[in-house]
Amino acid sequence: MTKQRNVLGEDLEECSRDPLTGWYRDGCCNTDENDHGLHTVCAKVTTEFLEWCKEAGNDLITPHPEFGFPGLKDGDGWCVCATWYARAVEAGKGCPIFLKSTHENTLKILPIETLKKFAIDLS
């Protein structure tokens, strides 16, 4: 696979290997035309974010081993769906993100200015 790009226009960096994340379960927020959920935002999830997602209908806490999903806890890195992340931001529940590990396709959903407000990997 060709190296994909992040929202900063650089090579996409790894998001998490423990738990193993990504549309391809390769540790990166890589995507393709089959990823209808656009799992492209590398988030460091918080309890508040996870609880909000569950209440809103996207349970990221409960494990689903049949889908290779371990269930998430506070502090885990995970490639979150861009549309769900946008909804969380609107609701005031956005969690920290790693821009260097967030896929450029996220910019189709959220502007870079919004993403930078939650970035924890900019100096």
Task: Please give the residue ranges for each predicted region.
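Short, compositionally biased
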Residues: 85-108
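Short alpha-helix capping/helix-loop boundary micro-motifs
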Residues: 61-68
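Extended boundary segments
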Residues: 1-49, 112, 119-121
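Short, charged/polar surface micro-motifs in flexible loops or helix N-caps
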Residues: 47-51, 84-85
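Glycine- and charge-enriched low-complexity intrinsically disordered segments
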Residues: 103-123
